[in-house]
Amino acid sequence: MFCYWGDDVRAGFGLVKPDGVKKTTSGVFFCSPKSRIKQLAPGKGLVGFVRGEGNVSVIRVPPAGGLQCGRLKNLELKDKIRLMSCGETQAVLLTYAGRSFWMDKHNHCRPIKELSSWNVIQVVCGDQHCMALTQDGHLFTWGQNSSGQLGLGKGEPSFLSPQPLKSLCGIPLAQICAGGDHSFALSLSGSVFGWGRNSAGQLGLGDTEDRYIPACVNSLTFKKTVFISCGEEHTATLSKGGTVFTFGSGRYGQLGHNSFRDERRPCVVGALWGSEVSQITCGRHHTLALVGSSKTIYSFGCGEQGQLGNGQRTDQCVPFPVHLPPDANHDQSVEQIVAGGNLSFVLCSQQEADNSSVHPESNRGRGILTLGDRMIDRWISECDSNQWRTIKKEIKRVFSSEACLNASFLKKSCDEHYQTSTSFSGLDMESVRAAVKRLAQKEKVLLEVGKIVEKDLLPSLGSTAVGAEALRVYLILPEILRVLNKRLHETKLTVELASALLKLNPSMLQALVKYWSELSDDFLKPLVKLFHKPSAHFVSQRTFNRQAESSDGHLQNLVHVLQMLYKVSCSGKRKITSGDFVIYEINVLFEICTLALLNSTPCIFNLEAKCNLLKLRQVRTCFRLVLRRSALLEDCFAQLRTANQTALKGWLQVVYSEKFEETDVNKRDFFLNVFRTLLEPESKMFIYNDTKTLIWFPAEPSLQEESYFLFGCLCGLAFYNNSVVNLPFPLALFKKLVGIQPTLEDLTELSPVLGRSLQYVLDYSDEDVDCLDMTFKIIWDNKEVELDPNESGKVVTSSNKKEFVDAYVDYTMNKSVERVFEEFKRGFYKVCAQNVVQFFQPEELRGVMVGTEEYDWSILKKNATYEELFYARHPTIVSLWEVFDGLSEKDKKAFLLFLTGFDRVPILGMNQVKMRVRPLLNSTEDHLPQALTCHSLLELPMYQTKRTLEAKLKEALYHKRGFWEE
């Protein structure tokens, strides 16, 4: 049965004889054409009918009050038509084979040659524009572009031929829809994109500004939208649960909101709430909704031409049932409702209601290709048969298309993929891995996939799609490349993928990084290996082949991706370690120009390489400090105060006015003594913890803030000149220098008692916390402080205990020292390049500056070398080590200070101390041992007895160390 109502038209549209058309009292006409109508395509000025056998008829319908309706005309086409869509005067037709035809106002049809090589699955028409969706997910638009309805960008002209809509490239589309002068696209995971005319808010974006490129309707995010229909100036959407949203023009009540006002954002049609609507359709100014379970059709909007089917010719702003013929309510089921122009249609059949009543998404037409188990199994089982040519074509269609891959492997359990966002991909990674594993069962199939990925897919990546669904391909591809690389032993595909990743716009790249953070270690670790292996290859190539400069760009891209993955691995508890990122080959690559390319990716450097990089500064100038021994700190600060930034970055030379000579010994002794002076309590620069082992900045400094700036410069000089100094700060200082916020753990290091107390507060039960009688008032650095200045005396409770602890840590580590720390930081970075410092983790930075206390004396002895008359079994050397082994730990540290100028071990360990021993020329047993600290050189008289050696060595260790203790 075929029902219709609305504009005055030829009886039965000419599908049946006039006497075969019946009419109800409510103005609904119905008839039973001999040839089954498969699809209806009403437009603003014509209606198309697709018959069950694929033949097409059209009839021209003039505007209301215009000329008489035309006659039904059959189109002479050799191809069988599956689908058609009509605009104001034109139509687009689609064959079962995916060929598309254009029908002009004279009903003449011609193939759309620009789409001849594409398998089209959906076509839609607005008043004067058209869209076509292909099987591999490409969207084309053409026609009038007066309001941006083609989505090609502002200022683009109208086009007579189809143009690719690149801004939606990669989005797996489920449906396309066109209104008067606006357009919509719906993704498989329910994202809604609109563009074009927005005069009444019909795009649902909260305003009335036209859009010239697709914009995501955020109000419909997570609503599980499965279908869209557009009127001339309004839009309706349907969710999977049967909820209807409408927006745009409400002038005729077509929104169904019990008002005639426009809505700029999607609003639920309240009268249909809970009815589980299964189909919706929009006419020019009216809307229909079908509740499949009750076979009830509701109408609302403009009724001037009787298009509401209620026997009235008045507008209606709330949904009311359409009075269908009795047969439609009893013996027949509603297959499809369609509205267009000022007409409404219903197709009924004798059969039981099929899925079209329950799942309105079937009304979209065919969907884009997806990669699934059946397809893969067929490829594997038939690839050695005469079907291989067909299989190759399918592989090309799927693996050359971002959209097809993005439509595959969705998490459909509990409709999870409808929650896709910039923080959730909606992708089932286990299914991805299983599918790739099956593909690898036939090398012939896998290699063909690799060929298409390399030739077609990878070069097309890097677009700036407007939706998160376009990013799934970047999670799928690594799984494919991982298997391909094992078979092919190549890296070029990974290089191309890295390049594509870095072409993504920043917001999309940030979303992808979020997706990575949600991956389990089983998927993240192979991802790290995928980019690490070619990175190491290029570094090795660069190390041993100076002609490999052409690969520097590839290397830079690869390590950039590695650095992003490193940050992901650090964000949670992972089995992935920092060692998984280190490229050990870089330790022998000391070419400045290449290392400069890698200076933003510290994850690939181990500590040894970082320290070597620090030594490789391209500095040719020196920064000279000329100091008086008696006014060391005063002279130092005076010269730092006036030094320019460029000069400070030179290699440090220290000269004493009393004895004008340049030696590295001067520099080491300078740092030793100047830091000793600054850290004495008498300097009043710092506060000490309870055990006097660590220092921190004061909340109320008694010295000028400039002192901390100069202290920062001094610390910067020590760092840049590879000098280990006494800097007993907690790790918090080094965290703050590299932009990492201190935590309760850092406060506990500074003040163990306080830190443990705060941890107890967090661990206490709610009842215990409420009984503590604590407030947000604390004492720090002998000063009372309200941690919540907006609420004096605020009580600590179970609900705010974390807030209290966080505020305590923030005050002690940040707020209380903000001014002095910022001065210190400013001074430090006046000397040091920030990107160099941030190469180091906080623990590494502290280790480089302060050294470690891992004293492995056996390594010192093992690495010692002997010169001139000395050798390992020389009696004096044997006595030396016997004496050394008998020294106390304090004396051994004093020996290290005497030998190197540092009393702590370099961060890389005792292996870095290369002790040399030679005889002291022209010496007697009365002479003390001497040391050249810049060379770790011990000059030792040839003492006749071990006893003499021991006495003289101990005397030397604690002898007054030079100039200022005369």
Features from the language model and the residues they span:
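Conserved beta-strand position repeated across blades of beta-propeller domains
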Residues: 41, 85, 93, 124, ...
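Blade-level signature of beta-propeller repeat domains, shared across WD40, Kelch, NHL, RCC1
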Residues: 296, 302, 313-369
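Short coil/turn segments that connect the beta-strands within blades of beta-propeller domains
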Residues: 38, 44-45, 53-54, 82, ...
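Hydrophobic, conserved cores of late-appearing folded domains
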Residues: 569-760, 820, 845, 923-925, ...
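Conserved core positions of repeat-based scaffolds
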Residues: 4, 46-49, 58, 90-93, ...
